[in-house]
Amino acid sequence: TANRYHNADLPQREFDADKAAYHYKKSGHSGKIQLSASDAAFAGAVDAAQLMANSAAEAGIEIEVIREPRDGYWSNVWNNDAKGWCACYWGGRPTEDWMFSAAYTNDTDWNDTAWKGTDASAKFNVLVKEGRAELDDNKRREIYAECQRLIYDDGGTICPLFNNYV
């Protein structure tokens, strides 16, 4: 990875239909979940959304993929509370702080997972500020590793793929 403080100790999660079904039932949600997608988000986003829907169906979770027009996707669909869950793309950021601050802190307009209001997200917000100010490289690494663990355990990102930057 290009990120200096990448936490390589976090294992990649594998799809587990039984676990997905358990958590879906535990959530109290029932019925269809709508997923808005457009190839404006990234090339193949609609196909990726359909693949996710097919996998979710194995767990008894019905996802309705809504193909949105490319024109106006970022202003009319992405991060629009009325649309809810939607496909998006995050390009790499040069520093962990920039990525955390742009996408996950509770005070950013781009927090498209709406990760707010949990003990973990509150701790994350404090740690991001501490990490930004920390001059000791080893301490900063520990802080950012914990930030990544909090996102991994409590955040709302579903990341079906990673882009390879060469």
Where are these regions (language model features)?
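Short helices/loops that flank or line small-molecule/ion binding pockets
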Residues: D47-A59, D71-K83
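Ligand-binding clamshell of periplasmic/extracellular solute-binding protein-like
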Residues: R67-R70, W85-M99
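Loop/turn elements at helix/coil->beta-strand transitions in domains of secreted/extracellular proteins
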Residues: H29-Q34, A57-E62, D81-W85, D154-T157
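Extracytoplasmic/secreted cell-surface and envelope-processing proteins
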Residues: G44-D47, S75-N76, P94-W98
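Extracytoplasmic/peripheral linker and loop segments enriched in polar/acidic and small residues
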Residues: E58, E62-Y73, M99-V166
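Secretory-pathway/luminal and periplasmic proteins that interact with or process carbohydrate-rich
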Residues: R4-P11, A82-C86, Y152-C159
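Append "and occasionally in soluble cytosolic enzymes with long acidic Gly/Pro-rich linkers
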Residues: T1-N54, E58, K123-L127, E146, ...
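Active-site-proximal beta-strand/loop segments in catalytic clefts of secreted hydrolases
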Residues: S36-A40, I66-E68, Y89-G91, L161-N164
